[in-house]
């Protein structure tokens, strides 16, 4: 029963509803601390902590944000951190330097390990009850981090939300909107951010003449400031940079798809080591995979394929595809009040199972 009430606390404080708003009148808000961790390279990096009412020897949850300039300040991640702290879990939101720069790099795996080691050494947490969740691109990167021998005392629960199985397939979806779960083909309107992530990361592999720093500055402004400085930046660029930006942001032509494919061929050896499809056989721990059915950044089919591949190898995996969520946002729910209640119940049961070690 204790697990049930804690699960209910999390769900009611994550999904907007009148009951959750009413409960805030009777609950003391978690204390929020700005702390830090040190990377292998010696850099001190900010880490936000949500503290529950109980101060000593409590379970812990590390939430690794995805690739976003908001990093540890991301609104949806902070909403989840607040909810889990209200349920009695000390919750950590680390900044991963490259991911804040909208870069998907091998170095981020090292920094995720640095975070885990920092949390594990704390005196105010139960070291046997640490759960970790990686969001978006950070999900599969953290799964790989768990293969490192420094995490031999693995998290009590390893969670990946809205992430990819095959990095190359996920990036191709960002351009074409086409995806497959291995049995059925789907076509969606891909989120613009996916295109920006692709080109921002791999500009130097394009054959087009351009100034990468100019184009990256423009793309980063699109995601960090909603393009607030875009017109000013664009006006100052030479013509070849403008032409490339136009292709990246809005061109859906066959030429762009071919341009992307040329880049893919060059970077395959970079993408493969970051893809679970490459290290499936090394995964020897239970995995919890969640995905939004309406996700247009990384399609839910990536999680379906990941689950199927693990099951075929006899590995333990638990999966939940939510019709309530897209990538990090809650979509309008069109199945009526009863449908919403049933979906929340399904979600709650999965969260209760997934976070059982720390609730």
Name what the model sees in each region:
Residues 77, 285, 299-309:
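Short alpha-helix in the alpha/beta-hydrolase fold that links the catalytic acid
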Residues 172, 233-273, 277, 304-308, ...:
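C-terminal catalytic histidine-bearing segment of alpha/beta-hydrolase fold enzymes
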Residues 283, 289-291, 295:
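Short beta-strand/loop motif that positions the catalytic acidic residue
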